[in-house]
Each structure stands twice: as structure tokens, then as C-alpha cells.
């Protein structure tokens, strides 16, 4: 399986977990409001709370942990959304930017072509000598850049498969070593997920930046 798909799947699972946690939190808040009302369910809840005080205890706990729950759910949505939606679009975003850059180069070539042709003129038919060489390099850039962009794209995909496979295999080992006998719990999961997300972003951008790097370095 392509490592990029594995990264996206982890983002999907994270977003589903965040949505489930948000749903549970909203349900708990709704039940708390029902208890405060005078509906049939609210009256029964008031009677049960008067006998056991469980309702007041749960309301106090929910009120105390609400900021932490909201923060954790928000972090999970951001990290999960980054892995699930943004990361798979990075190759297209970079490719689109490179294509627009090539169109700009074509526009520059259209403007510069008459000037380049003018440099070939001379009273003795020899033109302006070595000053015309820049035009040939520019023409080569216009013609060859799309092919080199495709080469860079495939090189980036191959590099991502190698680097992503290595990351997915080694990250779990590094995590197990770092968390040996640790009991930090849910907050550590969020921080490690943030570390993994940042490493994935760096990897994918570094690999598919070859779409831009290969033409610039070759031409």
C-alpha cells in the first residue's frame, strides 16, 4: 500500500475519532440541559439526582473537563484533516504551481522572441555573437521543462514510497522506545500525532518539490 494512502487513512481514523468524541460531548451537554428542564425526562432526572446526587457530580466533572475536551477534539480535527485532506493534495498543488510557472515562462518567451531575433541581425551577417546564446537556452527551457517536470514527478513518487515506508516502519519503533514505561496517556498521543504529521508534511513536500527542482537544476 502506498505510504501516502496509509497517512491519509490515519487522518481519516483521527477525524472519525474526533467526530465521535464531539458527538459524545454534545450528547452529554444535551442530557445535562434536559436534567435542568421540566420535561418528563427532566423531572425523572431531578428525582434521581435528588436521591443519588449523581447528576450534580457528572455535571461538575463535565464542566471541569470541557476546555480540555474541546482542545483535544480541535487538535484531532486539525491533525486528522491535515493528513486526510491536505497531504494527498500536495502532489497536485505542487504540480499545478509548476504548470503555472511554465505558462509564465511561455509568456516571457512570446515577449522575448522578437528581441532574440533582433540579436541575430548585424551589418556583416554575424549577428551579436555569443549574446544570442541566452535565447537558445531560454528556448530549451520552454521545450524541455514539461518533460523534466514529469520526470521529477515520478522521481518524487518513488522517493515518497521509499521514504514513507521507512517512516511508517521506524516511527512505531521510535515511539515504543520513547514511551517505554510511560503513563502520560491521551496527551502524549496528540503530541506524537503532531510529530508524525509534521514529518509526513516535510517528507511529501521534499519529495514532490523535485517537480520544481529537476528542471531548475538540469536546464
Short names for language-model regions:
Residues 102-110, 152-162:
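Amphipathic, heptad-repeat alpha-helices with coiled-coil/zipper character that mediate oligomerization
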Residues 134-152:
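Loop-to-transmembrane boundary segments
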Residues 106-125:
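Outer-pore/vestibule module of multi-pass helical membrane proteins
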Residues 103-107, 146, 206:
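Generic structural signal for bulky hydrophobic/aromatic residues embedded
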Amino acid at each position: 500500500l502506498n505510504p501516502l494512502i496509509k497517512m491519509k487513512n490515519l487522518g481519516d481514523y483521527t477525524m472519525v475519532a474526533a467526530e465521535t468524541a464531539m458527538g459524545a460531548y454534545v450528547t452529554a451537554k444535551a442530557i445535562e440541559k434536559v436534567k435542568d428542564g421540566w420535561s418528563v425526562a427532566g423531572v425523572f432526572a431531578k428525582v434521581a439526582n435528588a436521591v443519588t446526587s449523581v447528576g450534580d457530580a457528572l455535571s461538575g466533572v463535565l464542566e471541569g473537563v470541557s476546555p480540555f475536551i474541546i482542545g483535544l477534539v480541535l487538535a484531532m480535527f486539525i491533525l486528522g484533516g491535515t493528513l486526510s485532506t491536505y497531504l494527498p493534495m500536495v502532489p497536485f498543488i505542487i504540480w499545478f504551481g509548476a504548470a503555472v510557472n511554465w505558462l509564465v515562462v511561455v509568456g516571457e518567451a512570446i515577449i522575448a522572441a522578437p528581441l532574440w531575433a533582433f540579436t541575430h541581425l548585424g551589418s556583416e551577417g554575424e549577428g551579436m555573437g555569443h549574446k544570442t546564446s541566452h535565447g537558445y537556452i531560454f528556448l530549451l527551457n520552454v521545450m524541455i521543462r514539461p518533460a523534466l517536470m514529469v520526470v521529477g514527478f515520478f522521481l518524487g513518487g518513488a522517493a515518497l514510497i521509499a521514504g514513507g515506508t521507512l517512516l511508517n516502519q521506524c516511527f512505531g519503533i521510535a515511539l515504543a522506545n520513547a514511551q517505554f514505561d510511560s503513563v502520560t496517556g491521551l496527551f502524549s498521543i496528540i503530541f506524537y500525532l503532531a510529530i508524525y504529521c509534521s514529518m509526513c508534511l516535510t517528507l511529501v513536500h521534499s519529495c514532490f518539490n523535485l517537480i520544481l527542482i529537476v528542471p531548475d537544476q538540469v536546464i
